Every structure is written in C-alpha cells, then in structure tokens.
Amino acid sequence: MALRTRLGEILRPLNSQYGKVAPGWGTTPIMGVFMVLFLLFLVIILQIYNSSLLLNDVQVDWMG
C-alpha cells in the first residue's frame, strides 16, 4: 500500500502525462534556442581562458 502525501497529490498531474508526445514540434525550438545560448556561453568562456577575448581588469593568471 502506497503512502499518500500532499506533494504526491500535487505532482500527480505531471506523471499522468508520462509517455505522451506533444503534437508537432512541441518544445523543440525552445530547446534549440537554449542549446545555442549554451554554446555561446562555452565559446565566451573558452575565449576568456585562451585570452582571445580581452576584458579590462580581468587577469587570467592561474599561478597567483
């Protein structure tokens, strides 16, 4: 016998959608936008680390 909790009752509607697929493209475009933003973030971090992107008063001296 399962224990019924208030949190379980609140989350039950989310679980009832399990296995269903949204019609059409669904949220794929939103995922694509976030992937591009994450890629841009990684490129900026890489450029700062590689000193390709110079920022005022930002030192990339790892020795101290």
Swiss-Prot record:
The chain crosses the membrane at residues 29-49. It is found in: Plastid, Chloroplast thylakoid membrane. It comes from the Eukaryota. The keyword Signal does not apply. InterPro entries: PSII_PsbH, PSII_PsbH_sf. It is a single-pass membrane protein. PSII is composed of 1 copy each of membrane proteins PsbA, PsbB, PsbC, PsbD, PsbE, PsbF, PsbH, PsbI, PsbJ, PsbK, PsbL, PsbM, PsbT, PsbX, PsbY, PsbZ, Psb30/Ycf12, at least 3 peripheral proteins of the oxygen-evolving complex and a large number of cofactors. It forms dimeric complexes. One of the components of the core complex of photosystem II (PSII), required for its stability and/or assembly. PSII is a light-driven water:plastoquinone oxidoreductase that uses light energy to abstract electrons from H(2)O, generating O(2) and a proton gradient subsequently used for ATP formation. It consists of a core antenna complex that captures photons, and an electron transfer chain that converts photonic excitation into a charge separation. This is Photosystem II reaction center protein H. It comes from Cyanidioschyzon merolae (strain NIES-3377 / 10D) (Unicellular red alga).
